[in-house]
Amino acid sequence: MSVLEESLTSTVAFDVERIRRDFPVLQERVRGKELVYLDNAATTQKPLTVAYALQHYYTNENANIHRGVHLLSQQATFSYERARGRVGQFINAAEPGEIVFLRGATEAVNLVAHGYGRQHVGPGDEVIVSQMEHHSNIVPWQVLCEEKGATLRVAPIN
């Protein structure tokens, strides 16, 4: 179990310094202070375990999933489905098929707004986002509301 997984499943407080060690970029100092990275809506820093897993995949297993009968494709498919199952267990999904991997939060929000929203939001409906939302979670809902005659509401944060 990685330090991050251990921290996320533990009932004790985060050991922030231990977690920071998994992210080499966070060892950098900026203007004499420890680097703090909070722009996770744009991109998220990866812990070493993820970097190592990606390096292994791209150098040893790189192949299309669900697209081939050759060994590399079968191995990639197995790894992909195993990851889907583990994520599903971690978030208590009813079944692994509920887990959809996308490139990032922006793509995910667009998929929900354009897929679910176009089918279920109509004239007079209200879509609510919080005042804290990143731009990428506002624009798709603005566009959807304009197209469907719905109202976009912003919930204030105290």
What are these model-predicted stretches?
Residues 1-158:
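Pyridoxal 5′-phosphate
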